[in-house]
Amino acid sequence: MGVVMLSESGTAAFFERIEAALQRAGIAPVHIRHTAGDAIPASALADADVLLAYGHFRCTEEVMRAAPRLRAVVSPWVGTDGFDMEAATRLGIAVVNGQPDEHTQGMAEATVMMILAASYGLPQARHTMESGAARPAEPVAELLAGKTLGIVGLGQIGRRVAALLANWDITLKAHDPFARDVPDGIELLPLDDLLRTSDIVTLHMLLTEQTRHLIDATRLRLMKPDAILINTARGGLIDETALFQAMSSGHLRGAALDVFETEPLPMDSPLRRLPNILLTPHMIGQTKQSRAALVDLAVANVGALMSGTLPKTLRNRTVAETWLRRWADT
């Protein structure tokens, strides 16, 4: 079976670590260094049974049809934003991602850090230091105790955030239309009700056509005056123009963003001018431990697929029966 790896400049070093680990496992992948936006020669995919690609690669139906042997598309990260899930399922192709526990823990810890930083006015403090202004006469920090936290998305990371904060004397609310077995102590609400009643809102949803600009101007207006918005999930979940307007008008007290609609965040983005926003370059939660675990899981997932086993991190679960039948027929 053939394994093709597809990396771009920002991910090449990480993919080289995966390549070396695959080779140690007895798998010899073909590693293609790709420039985002460029077409991939059909010949490069002709013998691919498994395609290991960076998550925002545009893996369209056309790309998948160019690989007649293709059984699976694998992202070593959580994100599979660029993969056409519907087409993959229709073609009997498994879509697999990587989310080891180390990644979940790192993202949850980092989210709590962002919540605390925004609550305690760290962005304002940095702005004061950089501008040379005097220390404010009145504190901007507010205790987290006694606040209401709204968690949008109760997947692994959202649940871990809730678990980390369970004993912090805060009220936990959540919105997730697909949630099952909601942990004790969390009140499940419709999104608009959560926004109206939460002091801090943190996003943990996947980016789909349905969730793009989930937080738009209308929903920002629903949020409490002086509320805080946290996003460590996907930039496209928030309408950044509407967010700038909500913050510059004073409606929101603060925000902390690790992800953006365009990455890296353009230097002329108006968000950069706000003194009460914490911006980080899509690196929050990425630890040495999680990076090593992502490599190990990518190798394990590829190995499982090559042996005819669907990994636990299968994203399009409805493909399972078709996929196993395709495997049995070869």
Predicted features along the sequence, with ranges:
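Glycine-rich NAD(P)-binding loop of Rossmann-like domains
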Residues: 102, 125-160, 187, 323
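Rossmann-like dinucleotide-binding domain for NAD(H)/NADP(H)
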Residues: 96, 226-330
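Phosphate-coordination loops involved in phosphoryl transfer and adenosine-cofactor binding
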Residues: 1, 70, 145-148, 217, ...
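Phosphate/diphosphate ligand-binding glycine-rich loop within oxidoreductases
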Residues: 49-126
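Oxidoreductase and adenylate-handling cofactor-binding alpha/beta cores
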Residues: 108-127, 166-170, 297-304, 309
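N-terminal glycine-/charge-rich "phosphate-binding" loop or analogous flexible N-terminal tail
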Residues: 1-50, 169, 306, 322-330
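Short acidic/histidine-rich motifs immediately flanking catalytic phosphotransfer sites
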Residues: 43-50, 68-71, 196-201, 224-227
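Rossmann-like adenosine-cofactor binding region
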Residues: 59-62, 171-173, 177-270
